[in-house]
Amino acid sequence: MSEAMMWLMARGVWETLMMTFVSGFFGFVLGLPVGVLLYVTRPGQIIANNKIYRTLSGVVNIFRSIPFIILLVWMIPFTRMIVGTSIGLQAAIVPLTVGAAPFIARMVENALLEIPSGLVEAARAMGATPMQIIKKVLLPEALPGLVNAATITLITLVGYSAMGGAVGAGGLGQIGYQYGYIGYNATVMNTVLVLLVILVYLIQLSGDRIVKAVTHK
């Protein structure tokens, strides 16, 4: 492999990491409050509202059901309106964020559902407000589950970013498609594959260690 290709690979790794972590961050900015709202508005919860819950749940399910490659193409006009282009690193972050947010919201809801109901009831009995329960009970108790959700999301986004590379998003996916598939270069394709596996492994390893650190003894 030439030196130029090695530099291209290094740039691809950087672009993949940027797409993954930036879209993961914005995905959590959108998905975390939606997930919390899904939990607290469920029947029997602290601010139960069946209409809000069904509406939010329906929207989340709709976006979760759309395959990412279709979402990527469908969002081209919106992406172009937001960042001024439909190709490249910045353009990829928009559909990646939209694709990640409903996935995160549902995992946040599931993490909160694992909290023993007795903790919430005890907080309510002591006169805690819904916001206090969310900040002082729900989020701290669900932290290991939320970290695990973040880990799964980032790994999923690595795969999404690789798919986005096939339509000009950049990163390792574009290198693998352009030079490996179109250019019939097995060495490039195998190198991209190995790098993606390493990225996923490192993300999972880091996530497991953080979960262990924040888990209540």
From Swiss-Prot:
Membrane topology for this entry?
A: Multi-pass membrane protein
Q: Which cysteines are joined by disulfide bonds?
A: none
| Transmembrane residue ranges | 20-40, 58-78, 81-101, 152-172, 186-206
Residue limits of the ABC transmembrane type-1 domain?
A: 13-204
Q: Which UniProt keywords apply?
A: Amino-acid transport, Cell inner membrane, Cell membrane, Membrane, Transmembrane, Transmembrane helix, Transport
Q: Which GO terms describe its cellular component?
A: plasma membrane
Q: Where in the cell is it found?
A: Cell inner membrane
Protease as UniProt keyword: no
Please indicate if the UniProt record lists Cell inner membrane as a keyword: yes
Q: Which InterPro entries match?
A: AA_ABC_Transporter_Permease (IPR051322), MetI-like (IPR000515), MetI-like_sf (IPR035906)
Give the UniProt record's GO annotations in the biological process aspect: D-methionine transmembrane transport
NCBIfam families assigned to the protein according to its UniProt record, in alphabetical order = PRK10782.1 (NF008049)
The function of this protein is: Part of the binding-protein-dependent transport system for D-methionine and the toxic methionine analog alpha-methyl-methionine. Probably responsible for the translocation of the substrate across the membrane.
Q: Which PANTHER family match?
A: ABC TRANSPORTER PERMEASE, D-METHIONINE TRANSPORT SYSTEM PERMEASE PROTEIN METI
Family indicated by similarity = Belongs to the binding-protein-dependent transport system permease family. CysTW subfamily.
Q: What protein name does the entry list?
A: D-methionine transport system permease protein MetI
